[in-house]
């Protein structure tokens, strides 16, 4: 009897935890219109929309969507927002003129106009093509983008990502990094914004005045202004040339 009671209690506890999780999932999946000047149902070519005139404030996945005007397609669960558009999620802020929000995919799509992503340290990424997943807190940009850190140094590339949960920018394809004294070109670079640390990989080339250096990996400590290059390091100056396994540059 005691074993049966224990099993029953365990089963009920399991059901309760599943129920709480399901309720949380259901709450997170709902989009809530928190405020606006007006909201009304309209019919556009046979489709039902909620037309929202703002300033409007929506909430989804603990993320705020702000805009001047929005059309919310009830059937496809897509929100078209324009005018002073902002996405606010904890320490990450995205701003643009317009966006398309796919509710079932937790995805904010920015196309055409400039979109700006800024973290708590005022590292600022700008591009014209960006997707932001409000559930995973992950931004993906394509077709070119540039990030300026809080001190004005710039990293640019064809594509990349930003994971706000771990404060990590990733840049891929035709990556250029501009520092106060050194210019770096590489194929892939990761920038940990909370550590002020850039890590680069294969095919890295760096220039400082008339000096050139290449390697297949290394890092740059922004706070201490220190470069470290390793793996097939090749150095050329106007009068010398050398090879080594690793090299520090101050």
Across the structure, where does each feature detected by a protein language model lie?
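Bacterial N-terminal signal peptides that target proteins for export
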Residues: 1-9
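Long alpha-helical, hydrophobic tracts
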Residues: 2-3, 18-22
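Bacterial N-terminal signal peptides
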Residues: 8-17
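N-terminal amphipathic/hydrophobic interface segments
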Residues: 22-250
């Amino acid at each position: 009897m005691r074993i049966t009671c224990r099993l029953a209690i365990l089963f009920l506890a399991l059901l309760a935890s599943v129920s709480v999780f399901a309720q949380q999932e259901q709450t997170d999946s709902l989009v809530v219109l928190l405020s606006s000047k007006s909201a009304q149902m309209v019919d556009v070519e046979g489709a039902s929309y909620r037309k929202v005139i703002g300033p409007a404030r929506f909430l989804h996945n603990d993320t705020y969507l702000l805009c001047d005007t929005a059309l919310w397609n009830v059937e496809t669960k897509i929100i078209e927002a324009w005018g002073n558009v902002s996405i606010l999620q904890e320490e990450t802020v995205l701003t643009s003129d317009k966006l398309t929000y796919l509710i079932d995919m937790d995805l904010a799509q920015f196309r055409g106009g400039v979109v700006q992503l800024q973290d708590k340290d005022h590292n600022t990424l700008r591009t014209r093509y960006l997707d932001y997943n409000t559930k995973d807190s992950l931004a993906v940009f394509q077709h070119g983008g540039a990030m300026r850190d809080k001190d004005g140094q710039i990293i640019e590339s064809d594509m990349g990502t930003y994971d706000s949960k771990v404060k990590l920018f990733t840049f891929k394809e035709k990556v250029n990094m501009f520092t106060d004294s050194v210019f770096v070109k590489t194929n892939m670079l990761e920038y940990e914004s909370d550590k002020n640390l850039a890590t680069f990989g294969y095919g890295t080339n760096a220039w400082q005045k008339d000096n050139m250096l290449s390697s297949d990996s290394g890092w740059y400590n922004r706070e201490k202004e220190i470069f470290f290059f390793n793996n097939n390091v090749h150095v050329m100056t106007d009068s010398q040339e050398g090879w080594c396994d690793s090299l520090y540059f101050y």
